[in-house]
């Protein structure tokens, strides 16, 4: 190792900063977070530091640097653009065996600042030993995405409970197993949902040997296909799953992000070929959770938009199973954005309506009169099979047969296809589109030719012949 990683306790310790500009201000912000007592040596201060001085947050020595200013200082940072001054600060500190950092000048550093992921009291520090700071920053960003923000609560509660756990468990191995179970089980799940009191109750039950073998269900929206649209929260929950129930709308790229040793069960349904009934899926969620497993129900798009997620959670709730919901990017938002079709536009559409092509068998007919009105966008899910009836009803109720339409197949994926035509051609377009497909009806479709951005540039065809844009 070029550097030994250390965590320094700076609370109320004097730290000297030489320099009063923006770079100094960035370092001072870190020092404040660590509770340091900051002294600044500079002839002038930036407006930000001037305000901190007025607020009493820093001490200011409005003079030139002198070596004796290092007396009784814990460490020093030189943050000026004067290389001679910076070298003098380092030399004086080195002579006194005081840790020194000259910003962006590694040879003049006896310590360096790492990239930091702050989940205090849990702190992760990453360093490239000054060789590749951009790489360290990229790794920090990846860890920021993977580490839940609630880790700070988890670490704080664990700190408060260490003494009690030690009193109950004399063996270090026993204590280690206790915390391993807590950090990967129901205690961690409760923390992630912000249920801190319940989480501490769970620790108490575990200490008393009353831990219930009860799992939980997480309803997670997988988004429309592109794995990059999966939410950070969704990724974190998927990485903790014991078993994942997924449907056919979940892309392989998203499934690849599931924890490697998690069991995967396909409960997908297709029109006319339901491989698993909804009732069987509902019961399976309950059964698996009652076995103490962390169950993820992974649904394409958003689970509460035509995904029957509400029905599934009603059954889970009635069984007394804990659950949580992680929203996802719904297909109408994701697919249209990737196709360059805004759902609303000041000049073309003041409203948007989401419609499902799969209606309840005993449901009322749609309000076609309202849907046929102009200056609105219709986004129809699972509507390819009924495209002919949709077109006929809208035209019969007053919508122009030349209204622009788009059928977006496999939206947001690398093989996305966008088919453009008119309302009269909707059935033909739907027959050509790969599934899953979204129907979009309204004048906003015309903007596709101007602002399509994903994959190849749009290919404009005549209004008579539908255009196909293959974005593979």
From Swiss-Prot:
Instruction: Provide one Gene Ontology biological process annotation.
Output: siroheme biosynthetic process
Range of residues in the leader sequence: none
Spell out the CDD domains in the cross-references: SUMT (cd11642)
Which positions are annotated as binding NAD(+)? 22-23, 43-44
Instruction: Indicate which residues the UniProt annotation says bind S-adenosyl-L-methionine.
Output: 224, 300-302, 305, 330-331, 382, 411
According to UniProt, the reaction catalysed is: uroporphyrinogen III + 2 S-adenosyl-L-methionine = precorrin-2 + 2 S-adenosyl-L-homocysteine + H(+); precorrin-2 + NAD(+) = sirohydrochlorin + NADH + 2 H(+); siroheme + 2 H(+) = sirohydrochlorin + Fe(2+)
**Which UniProt keywords are given for this protein, alphabetically ordered?**
Cobalamin biosynthesis, Lyase, Methyltransferase, Multifunctional enzyme, NAD, Oxidoreductase, Phosphoprotein, Porphyrin biosynthesis, S-adenosyl-L-methionine, Transferase
- On this chain, the residues bearing Phosphoserine are 128
- Which Gene3D superfamilies does this one have? Cobalt-precorrin-4 Transmethylase, Domain 1, Methyltransferase, Cobalt-precorrin-4 Transmethylase, Domain 2, NAD(P)-binding Rossmann-like Domain, Sirohaem synthase, dimerisation domain, Siroheme synthase, domain 2
- Segments of this protein annotated with the region Uroporphyrinogen-III C-methyltransferase: 215-472
Free-text function comment from the UniProt entry: Then it catalyzes the NAD-dependent ring dehydrogenation of precorrin-2 to yield sirohydrochlorin. Finally, it catalyzes the ferrochelation of sirohydrochlorin to yield siroheme.
Q: What is this protein called?
A: Siroheme synthase 1
Q: What species was this sequence derived from?
A: Yersinia pseudotuberculosis serotype O:1b (strain IP 31758)
Specify the taxonomic lineage: Bacteria, Pseudomonadati, Pseudomonadota, Gammaproteobacteria, Enterobacterales
């Amino acid at each position: 190792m070029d550097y030994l990683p250390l965590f320094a306790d700076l609370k109320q310790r004097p730290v000297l900063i030489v320099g009063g500009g923006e770079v100094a201000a960035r370092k001072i912000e870190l020092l404040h977070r660590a509770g340091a007592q900051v002294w600044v040596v500079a002839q002038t201060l930036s407006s930000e530091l001037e305000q901190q001085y007025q607020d009493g947050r820093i001490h200011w020595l409005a003079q030139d640097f002198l070596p004796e200013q290092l007396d009784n200082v814990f460490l020093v940072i030189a943050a000026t653009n004067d290389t001679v001054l910076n070298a003098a600060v380092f030399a004086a500190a080195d002579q006194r065996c005081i840790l020194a950092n000259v910003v962006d000048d590694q040879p003049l550093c006896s310590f360096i600042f790492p990239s930091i992921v702050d989940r205090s009291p849990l702190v992760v520090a990453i360093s490239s030993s000054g060789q590749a700071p951009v790489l360290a920053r990229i790794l920090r960003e990846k860890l920021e995405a993977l580490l839940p923000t609630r880790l700070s609560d988890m670490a704080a509660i664990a700190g408060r409970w260490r003494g009690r756990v030690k009193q109950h468990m004399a063996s270090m191995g026993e204590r280690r197993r206790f915390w391993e179970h807590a950090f990967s089980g129901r205690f961690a799940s409760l923390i992630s949902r912000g249920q801190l009191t319940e989480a501490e109750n769970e620790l108490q039950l575990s200490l008393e040997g009353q831990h219930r073998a009860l799992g939980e269900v997480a309803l997670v929206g997988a988004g429309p296909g592109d794995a990059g649209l999966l939410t950070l929260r969704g990724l974190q929950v998927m990485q903790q799953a014991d078993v994942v129930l997924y449907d056919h709308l979940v892309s392989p790229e998203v499934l690849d992000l599931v924890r490697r040793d998690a069991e995967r069960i396909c409960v997908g349904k297709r029109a006319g070929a339901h491989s698993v009934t909804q009732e069987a899926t509902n019961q399976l969620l309950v059964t698996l959770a009652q076995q103490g497993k962390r169950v993820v129900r992974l649904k394409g798009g958003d689970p509460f938009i035509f995904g029957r997620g509400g029905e599934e959670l009603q059954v889970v709730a009635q069984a007394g199973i804990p659950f949580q919901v992680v929203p996802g990017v719904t297909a109408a938002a994701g697919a249209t954005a990737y196709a360059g079709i805004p759902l609303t536009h000041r000049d073309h559409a003041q409203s948007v309506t989401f419609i499902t092509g799969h209606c309840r068998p005993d449901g009322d007919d749609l309000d076609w009169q309202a849907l046929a009105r102009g200056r609105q966008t219709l986004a129809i899910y699972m509507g390819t099979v009924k495209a002919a009836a949709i077109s006929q009803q809208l035209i019969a109720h007053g919508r122009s047969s030349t209204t622009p339409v788009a059928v977006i197949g496999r939206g947001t994926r690398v093989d996305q296809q966008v088919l453009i035509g008119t309302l009269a051609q909707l059935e033909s377009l739907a027959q050509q589109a790969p599934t899953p497909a979204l129907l979009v009806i309204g004048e906003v479709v015309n903007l596709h030719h101007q602002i399509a951005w994903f994959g190849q540039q749009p290919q404009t065809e005549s209004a008579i012949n539908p255009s196909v844009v293959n974005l593979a």
